[in-house]
């Protein structure tokens, strides 16, 4: 039995007979599936829809990527159903998202992490991302590292950390603008990104103002940043140390260092 469910012009089922399509008319066929990850041996679940008019049979292939993941969603008001927005520097914003809990401050390679809205790291906390981890962002989503918080991306040569959109079809593999940015806010400190791929967003990394620390706001090593609709890296009056990095194919500028700062590449 198939895990796919069909709905043909409002009628659910798996076997449909005598469906009339008038001249110059059409029908809607909706397909959905819910797959138990433990019941499949391959990450690709496949099936076919067969169309038969009695004289000719044709098939349409159905292919679904089945992958377990950790999902991070913003909260929602139980009465109005309005999605929660972040409060930054004590002021409400229109940025949909929430702060990560202490239990969520380590991303591993056991399961991908899928982020809806902005996942924020609160002051005096550190988000650690381990080798081989994959972070998928939904549309207009991203990461925010708040004042006095830190980001540690600890990829390796053979196990890079990947940041990209959550549309994994081949047609989206090089499409810019699928998600927002990794925003290192003013006052975030000692951020380190090593052996990462950051691709297909609006701004790969947005880095804000210099802190009183003698260490760079961001140390960026062995990292590829490409296919962003606006900037690969946008640095505003900040401090960056970069070694062995590739930044390219951005809509406005691959690297923009503005309003002064200290930059060593």
Where are these regions (language model features)?
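Beta-strand/loop edge motif enriched in small/polar residues
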Residues: 14-61, 65-265
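Short beta-strand and strand-turn-strand segments in soluble, beta-rich domains
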Residues: 2-17
């Amino acid at each position: 039995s198939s895990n796919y469910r069909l709905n043909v012009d409002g009628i659910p089922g798996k076997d449909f007979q005598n469906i009339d399509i008038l001249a110059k008319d059409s029908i809607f066929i909706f397909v959905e599936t819910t797959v138990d990850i433990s019941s499949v041996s391959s990450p690709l679940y496949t099936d076919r829809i067969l169309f038969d008019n009695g004289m000719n049979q044709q098939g349409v292939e159905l292919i679904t990527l089945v992958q377990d993941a950790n999902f991070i969603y913003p909260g929602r008001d139980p009465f109005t159903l309005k999605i929660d927005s972040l409060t930054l520097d004590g002021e409400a914003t229109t940025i949909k998202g929430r702060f990560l809990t202490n239990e969520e401050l380590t991303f591993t390679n056991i399961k991908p992490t899928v982020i809806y809205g902005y996942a924020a790291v609160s002051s005096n906390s550190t988000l650690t991302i381990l080798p081989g981890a994959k972070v998928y962002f939904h549309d207009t989503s991203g990461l925010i590292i708040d004042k006095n918080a830190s980001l540690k991306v600890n990829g390796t040569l053979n196990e890079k950390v990947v940041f990209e959109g959550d549309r994994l079809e081949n047609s989206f593999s090089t499409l810019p603008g699928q998600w927002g940015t990794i925003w290192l806010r003013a006052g975030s400190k000692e951020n380190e990104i090593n052996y990462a791929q950051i691709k297909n967003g609006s701004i790969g990394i947005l880095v804000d103002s210099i802190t009183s620390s003698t260490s760079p706001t961001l140390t960026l090593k062995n990292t590829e940043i490409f296919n962003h609709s606006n900037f690969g890296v946008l640095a505003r009056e900040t401090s960056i140390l970069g070694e062995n990095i590739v930044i390219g194919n951005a809509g406005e500028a691959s690297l923009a260092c503005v309003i002064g700062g200290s930059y060593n590449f």
